[in-house]
Design a protein with these regions (language model features):
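Short capping segments at the starts of secondary-structure elements
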Residues: 14, 26-32
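Short, hydrophobic-biased segments on the C-terminal half of alpha helices
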Residues: 52-56
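Hydrophobic residues on short alpha-helical segments
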Residues: 19-25, 105
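Glycine-centered, phosphate/nucleic-acid-interacting loop/turn motifs that mediate DNA/RNA or nucleotide
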Residues: 62
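Short acidic, hydrophobic short linear motifs in intrinsically disordered regions
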Residues: 31-39
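Amphipathic alpha-helical dimerization/coiled-coil segments
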Residues: 86-130
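Short, cationic-aromatic polyanion-contact patches
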Residues: 13-17, 69-88
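Short helix-coil junctions and helix-kink-helix linkers
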Residues: 38-46
Length: 132
């Protein structure tokens, strides 16, 4: 019997607060909860207990790993930023634009005037897509 290819794992859903912790870990890892709190101190007025709760949720979801370091744990991302961005982007397109790119581009170009550089980049993307 032929072995079936395993389906990709479902995307990991993370909250906006958890995403802030992930951004810190994507920039530098491993880090302890105290280091994460320090990195977020200028953006958030979160207590260390809040950081530990968010870290625990991320660990439970499989987004980060934890390695014992004496009396504390050091955390590293398992979820790649690129994978998370891709999942978030596709989810947005699916939810708001029924998976279609044309209405997405039309909406954003109506909301904000595209610069000449942005138009050039979009044209290049279309040309590259047509050539593939």
């Amino acid at each position: 019997m032929a072995k079936k290819d395993a389906a990709p794992p479902p995307p990991i859903s993370i909250s906006d607060a958890e995403a802030q912790v992930m951004e810190v870990l994507w920039q530098r890892h491993p880090q302890g909860a105290d280091e994460i709190a320090e990195a977020l101190a200028d953006r958030q007025d979160w207590q260390l207990a809040t950081i530990k709760t968010l870290v625990n949720r991320l660990f439970t979801k499989g987004a980060i790993s934890a390695e014992k370091d004496g009396r504390r744990y050091l955390y590293s991302p398992l979820l790649r930023r690129e994978d998370w961005l891709s999942s978030q982007s596709l989810g947005l397109i699916d939810r708001l634009f029924q998976g279609r790119l044309t209405p997405l581009v039309a909406h954003f170009s109506a909301q904000r005037k595209l610069s000449a550089a942005e138009l050039k980049a979009l044209k290049q993307l279309i040309q590259d897509y047509e050539n593939d």
